[in-house]
Amino acid sequence: MIAGIGIDVAEIDRIKRAVEKTPSFINKVLTKGEQAQLATLKNQRYYEYIAGRFSLKEAYSKALGTGIGRHVSFLDVEIIDNELGQPVVVSHPFDGPAHASVSHTGQLVFTEVILEKGE
């Protein structure tokens, strides 16, 4: 049974500017595991990854119904790409499965997260 659905869109250039202006942005948004994956990426893919994780975590918080803030932070959710490149939610506060999807254009990242609960 679906417990929540969240979607989000992020501008890659906006995230790139945030990282360039405040390099600690990465530490506020990405877990150590996500930062390890990020370290393997270069050029545009580097910023797509950061924007994607930012947007996925926003979508997750919307699916949870709380938004980012008091009840869930960016670092409470870890999303790691599997060997096929699929984003997998490996750590999160919701008691049930979480499914994530991300898509990129040259300028935008679109994300969706679905939370499931048992019946």
Curated annotation (Swiss-Prot):
Example of a GO cellular component annotation carried by this entry: cytosol
Main localization (coarse): cytoplasm
Keywords: Cytoplasm, Fatty acid biosynthesis, Fatty acid metabolism, Lipid biosynthesis, Lipid metabolism, Magnesium, Metal-binding, Transferase
Cofactor needs: Mg(2+)
Subcellular location as annotated: Cytoplasm
EC top class named in words: transferase
InterPro entries: 4-PPantetheinyl_Trfase_dom, 4-PPantetheinyl_Trfase_dom_sf, ACPS, P-Pant_transferase_sf, Ppantetheine-prot_Trfase_dom
Gene Ontology terms, MF aspect: holo-[acyl-carrier-protein] synthase activity; magnesium ion binding
Domain of life according to the entry: Bacteria
Enzyme Commission number: 2.7.8.7
Keyword Metal-binding attributed: yes
UniProt record, GO biological process: fatty acid biosynthetic process; lysine biosynthetic process via aminoadipic acid
Record Pfam families: ACPS
Binding-site residues for Mg(2+), renumbered to this chain: 8, 58
Coiled coil found in the keyword field: no
Annotated catalysed reactions: apo-[ACP] + CoA = holo-[ACP] + adenosine 3',5'-bisphosphate + H(+)
PANTHER family: L-AMINOADIPATE-SEMIALDEHYDE DEHYDROGENASE-PHOSPHOPANTETHEINYL TRANSFERASE, PHOSPHOPANTETHEINE TRANSFERASE
Physiological role: Transfers the 4'-phosphopantetheine moiety from coenzyme A to a Ser of acyl-carrier-protein.
Family: Belongs to the P-Pant transferase superfamily. AcpS family.
NCBIfam families: acpS, pantethn_trn
Name of this protein: Holo-[acyl-carrier-protein] synthase
Species annotation: Limosilactobacillus fermentum (strain NBRC 3956 / LMG 18251)
